[in-house]
Every structure is written in C-alpha cells, then in structure tokens.
C-alpha cells in the first residue's frame, strides 16, 4: 500500500509543480491499478477553503471506509462559482498542498467542472462520500437531487455514503467568527 501522499493537479500546472504532482489521467491509472489489486477506493470532493476540525474528522472517517482516499478539490474558478466573489480565501495549489499533508488522504486532484461527476466517472471509486449536512434528507439518506455525482456512482454500481456533520464546525461559521459576526 502506498504511504506517499501524491498531489494530482490540473494539466496546466503540471510543468510548474514538484515531480510528485500528476495529471488526472495518471491519477486514473494509479487508482485503477489499486482497484484491480482488490482495494476499495473512497472518493470525496469539496472546496476545503479554510481547513477546520469538521473537515479533518470528516476526512478521517472517509478514509476508514476504504483502502485509500481520493480528494478532489474545486478549482479557484469552481469555488467562486459555488461560493461567490471573494472566494476562495486560499488558492487552489495551496489548498492541494495542505490537504495532501493530511495522513488520511492518499491522493489529491483539482477539478474545474461544475461537479465532480466526470472525475467520479473516470475513477469509479467503490465509495463516494459527502458530508451529511451537504446532501441528506430528513431521514439521513442521500438526497440525490443535491448530489449530482450520486447518479454517476449508481450507474456503475458504487456506494453513496454520507458522513455526519460535526456541529459548530463549518467554513461559514469560521468566516463569520473571523468577521466578528
């Protein structure tokens, strides 16, 4: 099993990054190699703009559910489309490096699309995970209308799972606290 933390970035950054940064296609080769060896991949995605305890616990739990964890980060442009002007606070390559430093994350990639669906389709992880606060119904089951990636996962027979939100720990709450709100 790999113990190195590999950062996989968008192609345009490949020439300016350290040798352990790879393009999406190389990530797919590595993920598929591990899947063929019988390992269960876990995939999650998000902006992860200001890292906090809720993120860390979420990612640790995601990693426990499989043999390796792939984290797909929204690019700066994608984050702005989702969160609005002024975001992200931390540039994508810095977010990627920060996330790759966490021992629970095996692979990091950056995606620019509106959703991670195309990347999920390429990698076909055994398990797709999202935070329960993000996409659950009142009974705690995944709300497929809020999880566009879930349809992709279901098409190839993967599992969609939710991880409970850690109350009081969110990027929105952290930003409000910093602003004195």
Please state what every model-predicted region is.
Residues 3-181:
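Nucleotidyltransferase catalytic core that binds NTPs
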């Amino acid at each position: 099993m790999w113990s190195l933390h590999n950062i996989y970035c968008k192609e345009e950054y490949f020439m300016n990054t350290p040798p352990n940064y790879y393009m999406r296609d190389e990530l797919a080769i590595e993920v598929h190699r591990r899947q063929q060896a019988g390992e269960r991949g876990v995939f999650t995605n998000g902006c992860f703009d200001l890292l906090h305890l809720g993120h860390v616990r979420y990612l640790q739990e995601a990693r426990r559910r499989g043999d390796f964890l792939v984290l797909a980060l929204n690019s700066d442009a994608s984050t702005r489309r989702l969160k609005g002007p002024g975001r992200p606070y931390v540039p994508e390559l810095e977010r990627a490096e920060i996330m790759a430093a966490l021992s629970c994350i095996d692979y990091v990639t950056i995606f620019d699309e509106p959703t991670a669906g195309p990347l999920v389709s390429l990698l076909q992880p055994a398990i797709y995970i999202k935070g329960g606060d993000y996409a659950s119904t009142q009974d705690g089951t995944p709300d497929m209308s809020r999880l566009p990636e879930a349809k992709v996962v279901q098409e190839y027979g993967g599992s969609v799972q939710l991880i409970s939100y850690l109350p009081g720990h969110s990027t929105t709450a952290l930003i409000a606290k910093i602003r004195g709100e």
